[in-house]
Amino acid sequence: MPRRREVPKRDILPDPKFGNVEVSKFVNAIMQSGKKSVAERIVYGAFDIITTKGGKDPLEVFSAAMSNVKPMVEVKSRRVGGANYQVPVEVRPARRAALAMRWLRESARKRSEKSMGQRLAAEMLEAAENRGGAVKKRDEVHRMAEANKAFAHFRF
């Protein structure tokens, strides 16, 4: 690793519609090839679908989905004496949010609805109710950590 000064964290501006930093980060997570306006259209379209379909506040659904998908622990590979162990470690808050966004995005992409906005809305509504592909992924990661609890003393 370089021994230069530590790079400062960049402040992310809140999104223009809701004034929320988390939504802005999610738009950036959805974005492909720098096409931010397309990503915004997808996310805001999904929020509109949530409003019409569920009759709920899209920000509440989004935050509920995020909190249900965020992992508490994950496993990291650690080499000890010629053997690789999957060591359970706690997830940092910033990484929790990043993983939750990534899992929401990937499980939305795997869905069968017509547009990405519809897929994203359906995935967020399901995640808010503790079901769906992203929640399944979180449970899988938690199960792996639980199964390898015996190696927790190898923590980094």
UniProtKB/Swiss-Prot annotation:
GO biological process terms, semicolon-separated: translation
GO cellular component, one term: small ribosomal subunit
UniProt cross-references to SUPFAM superfamilies, sorted A to Z: Ribosomal protein S7
Keywords annotated in UniProt: Ribonucleoprotein, Ribosomal protein, RNA-binding, rRNA-binding, tRNA-binding
InterPro entries: Ribosomal_uS7, Ribosomal_uS7_bac/org-type, Ribosomal_uS7_CS, Ribosomal_uS7_dom, Ribosomal_uS7_dom_sf
Alphabetized GO MF terms: rRNA binding; structural constituent of ribosome; tRNA binding
Function: One of the primary rRNA binding proteins, it binds directly to 16S rRNA where it nucleates assembly of the head domain of the 30S subunit. Is located at the subunit interface close to the decoding center, probably blocks exit of the E-site tRNA.
UniProt xrefs under NCBIfam families: rpsG_bact
Subunit structure: Part of the 30S ribosomal subunit. Contacts proteins S9 and S11.
PANTHER family in alphabetical order: RIBOSOMAL PROTEIN S7 (PTHR11205)
Family according to the record: Belongs to the universal ribosomal protein uS7 family.
Protein name: Small ribosomal subunit protein uS7
The organism of origin for this protein: Dechloromonas aromatica (strain RCB)
